[in-house]
């Protein structure tokens, strides 16, 4: 079987609430860390989410 080219990552809120999203990314086409603006329901605003490792 072929090895999957996608890694599981955790996108953690920069607002300091501890809220996070999980997703996958193709490690070959995007080797740099992801940074996306998404909605944080704990502060009820759109904030930046940065990539961290899943423990």
Curated annotation (Swiss-Prot):
Superkingdom of source: Bacteria
Keyword terms: Ribonucleoprotein, Ribosomal protein
One GO BP: translation
Ribonucleoprotein listed as a keyword: yes
Segments of skewed composition (Basic and acidic residues): 1-11
Gene name of the encoded protein: rpmG
Compositional bias (Polar residues): 14-24
Protein name: Large ribosomal subunit protein bL33
Organism: Herminiimonas arsenicoxydans
Pfam family, one: Ribosomal_L33
Keyword Ribosomal protein applies: yes
A GO cellular-component term linked to this record: cytosolic large ribosomal subunit
Gene Ontology molecular function terms on file: structural constituent of ribosome
Region: Disordered, residue numbers: 1-27
NCBIfam families, A to Z: PRK00595.1, rpmG_bact
Family: Belongs to the bacterial ribosomal protein bL33 family.
């Amino acid at each position: 079987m072929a090895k999957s080219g996608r890694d599981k990552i955790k996108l953690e809120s920069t607002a300091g609430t501890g809220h996070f999203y999980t997703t996958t990314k193709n490690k070959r086409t995007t080797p740099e860390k992801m940074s996306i603006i998404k909605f944080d329901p704990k502060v009820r605003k759109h904030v930046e989410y940065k990539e961290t490792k899943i423990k």
